[in-house]
Every structure is written in structure tokens, then in C-alpha cells.
Amino acid sequence: MSIPSPAHRQPPGALALGGPVVAGRYQLKDLLGRGTLAQVFRAADLDGGPDVAVKVAVDDSAKHFERISNEAAVLAALRHPSIVRFIGLGVVPGGTALAGRPFLVEELALGPSLSEAARTGRHHPDVIAGWARGLFEALAHLHGEGLVHRDIKPANLMLSGLRRSPVRIVDFGIVAAAGSPAEPGVSSGTVHYMSPEQASGGPVRPSWDVYAMGLVLLELLTGSKAFPGTAIESLVARTLRSPHVPDSLGPGWPAFLRSLTAMDSAERPTAAEAAGMAARLMPVPVDEATTPCRRMAVFPARRIRQLA
């Protein structure tokens, strides 16, 4: 997807009222986050629409133009309530410190990240099961397009406050095609949530995202990372063993998490299968509870040996 050039400089008085205006209508306000590749701002819609998120590259190099363009193309192709919606892209106009940098406009996920949620304390397993279902359904949609996120972690999963999609996946900056080879000398993802095969630099696989989501869910339920320590300690540990999953997490959860984080990627469920498993861990609605029996998690036959 090509990035259009800025059509104009800043509107008169724009900087006096606040931050730069991009795409002719979105005025940058608060800095929401900063990474090695980009900064993310909350922006007001001067045409009266809801606030949006604007991701601005750290510089105007060709590499960052390509990254923003690729991320925009990915988001524009996706349509799922648990994936942030693409709005537009362009180049920051002149007259500001950000001038000339490519930017991406997307839907603003209103709530805190699951990283912040994890720090505030443990959450009820029924709530986490609902989050898991929506997130795995979103991953199934992404994987169905032949793409892999590669950086599933609590900081990239945002609470939205909406019933239809309580959690949303953000930051598609390093998405890659399934089956593509690892880039020599280039690290992808976040060390503490990488699968063993991602850490070793194998071909890109959807199972990477499934494993990472398993570690996220385990962290939410236990309150601690599965593989703590330095980056090297964390990487080495996951190549030697599966994460410890306590048996005390509640009915169905230990088997579910062990399947998601199996050392052998072939023993992990697909994202679509995982969404179904998460749904069976959710409480039965009152109007469906015609018997005292609670739904039990059912796992694909090919993983019975792994879970035994």
C-alpha cells in the first residue's frame, strides 16, 4: 500500500490549539506509547468523530515507510471485532518536529493493556476465558489470511470496554506470511513470549501465536511470567522444558494451557480450535443452564496423549 504525500502544511492556528494535524483532520494529543520503531498518539477528530490512534514512525527513512505501508496493508485486509480497524495513512505535513514521517491511523482501543491488567492483580478465570475466546477467534481470522502476528504479548492486547469485543489485538508492525523464512540477523517478537521454534529462528508458523497466547493466559491466571529472568535465561529455559502449569487453576484450564504451550508445535491446537476450547471454559448463560452440569473442555483426539 503506497503512502500519500501530505496535501498541505499545518492549518493556521493548529499548533497553537494542540499538536500537529495529520490527514487534514486528526490532531495529535497524548503520547500513548513509544517503541523502537514508532510512537503512538491519541488524536482528536476535528470533524467530530471519535478519538483515534495515530502511529508515527521514529524517522522518515525508507525502511520505516515500508514498515508503515506494510502494516497498513495488513490491517486494511482484516475485518474482525477483536482486531483494531484501519482508518488511513499518510505523511506528517511540514511545520512540526514530526514532519516527513509516515503515519498510520487506526481505531483507538480505549482500555488498558493486558500488561497493565496483569499488574493490577489476578482476574477471574471466567473473565479470562471470554478474553481468550475473542483473541483466538481474531488469530484464526489472521491465520486464515495466511499471516502470523509474531508479537503476541500482554502489551499488544488491549481491553476495549465493549461487550462484542472486550479485548483487541494491536501492533501488526512485524506481521509475516506463514511459511516465510526467518530474516538472518533480525529478531522478531518479544523474548518472554516466544515459542521454542520462534526463538530458534525457524520458518514463520501460526503455532507461534498460539504458544505466545498460552503464555499470556498463564501469566494472567498466575500473576507471574512463565519464563522470568534475563532474555538469555528465558530463551534457554523454553528450549529445555514446557512452562509449569499449576493443577489448581480450575476445571479445564491446566489441560488447555498445556496444549497451547506444548513443546512440539504439532501438538498445539489451531487458533480456531483454541477459540472453541476457551468457549467451553466460559460459564453457561442462565437461560442455557437447564441442568446442573457445567460445560467441560473437550480437546482434539490427536492431543490426548500430550495431555495425559
Feature-to-residue mapping (PLM):
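Conserved short submotifs of the Hanks-type protein kinase catalytic core
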Residues: 97-113
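Short beta-strand micro-motifs within the conserved protein kinase catalytic domain, predominantly
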Residues: 85-102
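Protein kinase catalytic-loop region centered on the HRD/HxD motif
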Residues: 137-147
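Protein kinase glycine-rich loop
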Residues: 29-35, 40
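Activation segment signature within eukaryotic-like protein kinase domains
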Residues: 131-132
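Regulatory extensions appended to serine/threonine kinase catalytic cores
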Residues: 286-308
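AlphaC helix of the eukaryotic protein kinase fold
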Residues: 58-77
